[in-house]
Each structure stands twice: as structure tokens, then as C-alpha cells.
């Protein structure tokens, strides 16, 4: 994005890029169309294929400047306001995209922002580049006493 680019121009550029790389949805989904599973129960081969498809799509967006949109420049982002991320997501929702693997959602949606916002500079330097380029995937372990996943007592 250039400094002169308005949100409408950004939206148009995003839509143009998406239309060159994806197929437009034939109809919009309604909330009544059923749920969307976050955690899939698939075999290892399918799991690897799905994660690879997610990473490839993410890398394509990253190369075009449509990933880490609201991340600071010093961490590999575009340095734009979060409203630009929202704009891109709204436009992307109009297209058929690869399914996003849950490990990638945890990595980019939970772990990366936590490291970016609260991690030491050393941790940021070590972790964020691999997360951003899709070469590193993270997991999040939770400890919930009396809820079946009390890792603290193990």
C-alpha cells in the first residue's frame, strides 16, 4: 500500500488480487448453512496436505502484501491499521479459499500475536520470522484443573 492509497483503493486492489488467484463464491453462505469444524479428525496424510495448502496460500498472500497486514514493519508486517486486515478478510470471504488448518490458526492467531506484543526482543527475533513465512507451526498447551486437561499436575 502506498501512503496515498485510500481504504476503497486498498479494497479494490485486494479484490483484484484475490480474483486473479481464487474462484469467486457462487453464492454467499448463510449462518444457517451449518457449523464449521475447527478441529478436524483426519488421518496424518490428510492433516499434512491441509497444513501444506494453508501454508502455501498464506505464503502467496504474504508475497503479495496481504498477510500480517496490521503487524509492525519491524516484524515483517505491512504496518497498516487493523481496519485494513478487516477489509482484506471481507474481500477474501467472497472467494473459495483453501481450508485453514487449525494449527495455523493457533500459530498465527494466538501464538504469534502474543509473542509479538509481549515477548522479549530475543524471542521475537527467533520466532516471528518463521511463523510469518509459514515455516514454523506452533501448538498451545492448556492446563485446566478439574476440566480434563490439568497439565500442571502431570
Pin down the residues of each PLM region.
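Intrinsic disorder at enzyme termini
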Residues: 1-11
